[in-house]
Structures are given as structure tokens and as C-alpha cells.
Amino acid sequence: MKPSFRRKARACALQVLYSWEISHNNIKESAIYFLKEKNKKNIDIVYFYELIIGITYDCKNIDNLMKPYLFRSLKELGHIERAILRISFYELHKRNDIPYKVSINEGIELAKLFGSEDSHKFINGVLDKAVFKMGYNKKVVIT
């Protein structure tokens, strides 16, 4: 599957997570409704569902992973920024097959598309700090 399909899956997941957080509707119903309105042709649907189900199922743990790297409380974050960070931290924590640099870059790109003017800088700062302190940036040498 093309990387652009996965990028679109992240963007769609972000929109559904945003809607879910505001409306408190059932996440699966929100996803089905959202996808009815979208052209699903170039979206990695399997990854889209993995993100929304995985993030909503493990939301408290993901939020706890983020907290040490934030300058303010989770509740003070905008809904978009919180959803972007949840996607990025989910990938960092659960998807070892995705390079950490990809997760950071995708989070930044989502922030540029959907966030406020300086959201991408905030997302970049949080993710850079997390990757460094969590040790994802260390190279593994196999001898």
C-alpha cells in the first residue's frame, strides 16, 4: 500500500477522533458515517480502523504517555492537537514497524493541515522531546 494511503488514513482518523471527542458518539458509528461521506479509494481503511479503535481503546494509557512531555494539561490542549498527539504516540508506542521519524513528520503534517497557525511547532516540540527521552532516537547495533 502506498504511503500516501496511510497518510490519508491518519487524516481521516484525526477527523473521526476529533468528532468523537466533541460528540461522545460511538467511535465505530462515527467512522462508518464519516467513511460514507468520503471517497475511500485512496485510504488505507485497515490502518484507519486500527488507529481509531486502538486509540480509543487505549486512550488513557496513551494520554499518560504524553503527559510528561506537555507544558500544560491535556484538557488545555485543543481537540485537534490532542488527537494528533494521540495518533503519533499510538504509533510510537504500538507500531514498531513505523520509524519514529515518520510518526513525527506525519504529526507535523497533520498539524499544518488541521491545526492552528503554530500547532505544527507545538507538535514537533512535544514529539521531539518524547522521542529523545523515550530513547526512540537511539540506533540499535546488532553484533
UniProtKB/Swiss-Prot annotation:
Family designation: Belongs to the NusB family.
Species whose genome carries this gene: Buchnera aphidicola subsp. Acyrthosiphon pisum (strain Tuc7)
Task: Give the PANTHER family listed for this entry.
Answer: ANTITERMINATION NUSB DOMAIN-CONTAINING PROTEIN, N UTILIZATION SUBSTANCE PROTEIN B-RELATED
Q: Which domain of life is it from?
A: Bacteria
Which keywords does this chain's UniProt record carry? RNA-binding, Transcription, Transcription antitermination, Transcription regulation
Q: Which GO terms describe its molecular function?
A: RNA binding
Its GO CC terms are: cytosol
Function summary: Involved in transcription antitermination. Required for transcription of ribosomal RNA (rRNA) genes. Binds specifically to the boxA antiterminator sequence of the ribosomal RNA (rrn) operons.
Matching InterPro entries, A to Z? NusB-like_sf, NusB_fam, NusB_RsmB_TIM44
Q: From the UniProt record, give one GO term of the biological process aspect.
A: DNA-templated transcription termination
Cystine pairings recorded for this chain = none
NCBIfam families according to UniProt: nusB (TIGR01951)
Q: Which Gene3D superfamilies match?
A: NusB-like
Q: What is this protein called?
A: Transcription antitermination protein NusB
